[in-house]
């Protein structure tokens, strides 16, 4: 047995499923998950000594690559002053100044410890601010594991939501309406059925949890218009897309102004950080200035703030997003060329430093139904054959891939060459 296999066997006796987040268990592709020893730049190194070109990037945060010296040094310097104080620090102020400068729609920002905390808190704030209970989310989008968000669509287009996890009471789910991503008609229908009851829409501007599905041109502006028409707030969940699709996020890339924005992943530079913010009048409703309660023992943790501040300063440098786009475009085009040579039907979506690989005969993938029609079994084989080639992709057909500026064009070309060999055998 390999060292990863031995560790996984031991982990399953001590940790549910052997992992601390389900997708890491390789249940979407089968086999034994890799146990990682270290990472540097664009590469992961497992406990058995094998190196991999990494397109998971810790599920998004590693936009600069692993073990970036500016972030590492900031963490070391901050740790020497203490790990946590439970009191305000100067770095929290500097971090808030930087975030609100980089994302102009955020007049104010509150730091939390995860993307789930950010979305959960933003929804509570939207409900408190509007005095309404219902929310709209989209089929195939993921916003963390808060009870109100672990909800699937009912059997009819306008039925109330149903829990998609045991432990979520139906009374919670009934306030969540699930619409179809990239389908404005379904959203209007929900508003028309509940015109005075919907507090907010929450949406991934690029859906990154049904692989990578960008919005159609009219979708995000249409959501903004519907929120304005019916008096609801628009929450854009930029946990994945923030500082990655563009410096000011997908909202800037697509030209839409939200009322609230949720951030995570890159904002922490690899440390556990989330944030939410937006319009001043809405944010003023948060405790201690307003009645909507939100708190956290480790929110604004000095080590995490130092890591995030260093990361965002690097991400804001000229050329970063142009490099991400160039590398991702080259990878997408190369994979499509290699697949066509082998007669493999393939769609590759990409925006900025995000991409998604779909084995499908369809010309495009624009919604949850399109994603579910793809060949998952072929993806599983592709994943393991690429892993054997030293390329680490997301171990699920329903998760996006992530590029970093640490990837070289040689890494990209080597990945395309590996895919060409795999496609020939697939």
UniProtKB/Swiss-Prot annotation:
Its cofactor is pyridoxal 5'-phosphate. CDD domains: OAT_like (cd00610). It holds the Pfam family Aminotran_3. Pathway: Porphyrin-containing compound metabolism; protoporphyrin-IX biosynthesis; 5-aminolevulinate from L-glutamyl-tRNA(Glu): step 2/2. It is found in: Cytoplasm. It is an enzyme of class 5 (isomerase). PROSITE patterns: AA_TRANSFER_CLASS_3. GO terms for cellular component: cytoplasm. The keyword Transmembrane does not apply. The keyword Protein biosynthesis does not apply. Belongs to the class-III pyridoxal-phosphate-dependent aminotransferase family. HemL subfamily. HAMAP family: HemL_aminotrans_3. Homodimer. This is Glutamate-1-semialdehyde 2,1-aminomutase. It comes from Escherichia coli (strain SMS-3-5 / SECEC).
């Amino acid at each position: 047995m390999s060292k990863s296999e031995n560790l996984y066997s031991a982990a399953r006796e001590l940790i549910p499923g052997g992992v601390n987040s389900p997708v890491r268990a390789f249940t979407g592709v089968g086999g034994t998950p890799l146990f990682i020893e270290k990472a540097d730049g664009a590469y992961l190194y497992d406990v058995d000594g094998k190196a991999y070109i990494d397109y998971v990037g810790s599920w998004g945060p590693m936009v600069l690559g692993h073990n970036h010296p500016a972030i590492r040094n900031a963490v070391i310097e901050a740790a020497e002053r203490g790990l946590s104080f439970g009191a305000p620090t100067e770095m929290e102020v500097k971090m808030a100044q930087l975030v609100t400068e980089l994302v102009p729609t955020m007049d104010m920002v509150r730091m939390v410890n995860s993307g789930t905390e950010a979305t959960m808190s933003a929804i509570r704030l939207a409900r408190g601010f509007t005095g309404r209970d219902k929310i709209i989310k989209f089929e195939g989008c993921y916003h963390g594991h808060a009870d109100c968000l672990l909800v699937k669509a009912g059997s009819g287009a306008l039925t109330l939501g149903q829990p998609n996890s045991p432990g979520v009471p139906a009374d919670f789910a009934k306030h969540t309406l699930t619409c179809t991503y990239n389908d404005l008609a379904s959203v209007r229908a929900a508003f028309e059925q509940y015109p005075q009851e919907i507090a907010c829409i929450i949406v991934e501007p690029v859906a990154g949890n049904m692989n990578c599905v960008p919005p159609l041109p009219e979708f995000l502006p249409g959501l903004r218009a519907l929120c304005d028409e019916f008096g609801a707030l628009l929450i854009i969940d930029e946990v994945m897309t923030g500082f990655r699709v563009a410096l000011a996020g997908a909202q800037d890339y697509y030209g839409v102004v939200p009322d609230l924005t949720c951030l995570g992943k890159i904002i922490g530079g690899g440390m556990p950080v989330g944030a939410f913010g937006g319009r001043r009048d809405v944010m003023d409703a948060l405790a201690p200035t307003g009645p909507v309660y939100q708190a956290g023992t480790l929110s604004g943790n000095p080590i995490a703030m130092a890591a995030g501040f260093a990361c965002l300063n690097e991400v804001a440098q000229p050329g970063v997003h142009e490099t991400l786009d160039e590398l991702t475009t080259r990878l997408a085009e190369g994979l499509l060329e290699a697949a066509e040579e082998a007669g493999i039907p393939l769609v590759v979506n990409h925006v900025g430093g995000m991409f998604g690989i779909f084995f499908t005969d369809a010309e495009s993938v624009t919604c949850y139904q399109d994603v579910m029609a793809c060949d998952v079994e072929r993806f599983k084989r592709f994943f393991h054959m690429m892993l054997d080639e030293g390329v680490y992709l997301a171990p699920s057909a329903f998760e996006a891939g992530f590029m970093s500026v640490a990837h070289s064009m040689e890494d990209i070309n080597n990945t395309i060459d590996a895919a060409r060999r795999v496609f020939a055998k697939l």
